[in-house]
Amino acid sequence: MQLEIKVALNFIISYLYNKLPRRRADLFGEELERLLRKKYEGHWYPEKPLKGSGFRCVHIGEVVDPVVELAAKRSGLAVEDVRANVPEELSVWIDPFEVSYQIGEKGVVKVLYLGDSEASGTPELDKEIKSSFNPDAQVFVPIGSQDSSLSSSPSPSFGQSPSPTFIPRSAQPITFTTASFAATKFGSTKMKKGGGASGGVSVGGSGAGGQQPPPQQPRMARSPTKNLLKHKSLSLSMHSLNLIPANPAPQSQLSPNAKEFVYNGGGSPSLFFDGVEGPSTSTTAPFGSGGASTCNSSSFDVSQVFGGGANSLFLEKSPFVEGLSYNLNTMQYPNQPFQPVVLAN
């Protein structure tokens, strides 16, 4: 009886898989098996298989068998859902050594299982059912039938291994090589969007690093003239222009290739201030040629560069003056009187 009930349940449940929740369909099969076994007690006649065949028939259609309604209710399914997903007017006869079905009132009765009453033989499946049988129904095993006697019985589906069980699919493990793992994001299996090898070696288009980042623009070195242009006022002091007499300066450490022009402090007594008399003593040019005592003829006149007049130094600034913001107190000659020098390469 257990084998015949299992064949009928696999056939009915095959229509519910992939249409209703799988867990609900399994519960429906378990409840229906339990109710059918209880119903067939005392009405199973192996010596007379056709006796009580109408009583053991399970019908699902316009009129649903009360056993099916109770099993659907206990499993949380609506009877309308069960009836809508099975063929119309489905009738299944569960008899000793034979299970058959009929679709429609005038349909042909086909055999699902036919056993030998004298010797237990392998089940025979209808060719049409074998080709159209839902493969998901093969793995349906009611909980109550998972005993040793049922596990040794053949399965009605395709005559394969008895009592198939649910086997979850194992996911394929993800493997990485050292190079491919280094090219992935930290904590993820996705590849980096762009990358290059360490040490400044860039990865090619076919490498594992992916796309190359855009080349960075070379950073411009900060020029000292940038700070010079910020401050447009001259920070010239009385001491730096040698207006106050000081000791003679030692030999300059400037490059001998530079052209040096020495300003004579007594050349223009009223260079910055009207009516202010400057010192009359002339300073010898340490870099003058032939040991000249004065630099009136060879020295560079600052007033000519700054506009020519005494009062035009701060009133009319030429482009040369605007870009000139040397702080002469911070030059490399802190202990020497300043000699204004213009370098030209």
Swiss-Prot record:
Q: What does the entry list under GO cellular component? A: cytosol
Q: Name one Pfam family in it.
A: BTG
Low complexity composition bias: residue spans: 144-164
**Tagged with keyword Phosphoprotein:** yes
Task: Give this protein's Gene Ontology molecular function annotations.
Answer: nuclear vitamin D receptor binding
The record ties this protein, via InterPro entries, to: Anti_prolifrtn, BTG-like_sf, PAM2_motif, Tob1/2
Q: In which tissues is it expressed?
A: Ubiquitous.
Q: What are the start and end residues of every segment in region (Disordered)?
A: 144-170, 188-225
Reading the lineage from the top rank, the first entry is Eukaryota
Where composition is biased (Gly residues), the residues are 194-210
Q: Which GO BP terms apply?
A: negative regulation of osteoclast differentiation; osteoclast differentiation; positive regulation of ossification; regulation of gene expression
Q: How does it assemble?
A: Associates with CAF1.
What's the family? Belongs to the BTG family.
Task: Check the record and name the PANTHER family matching this protein.
Answer: PROTEIN TOB2, TRANSDUCER OF ERBB2 TOB
Q: What does this protein do?
A: Anti-proliferative protein inhibits cell cycle progression from the G0/G1 to S phases.
Protein name per the record: Protein Tob2
Organism name: Mus musculus (Mouse)
> Which lineage?
Eukaryota, Metazoa, Chordata, Craniata, Vertebrata
Gene of this entry = Tob2
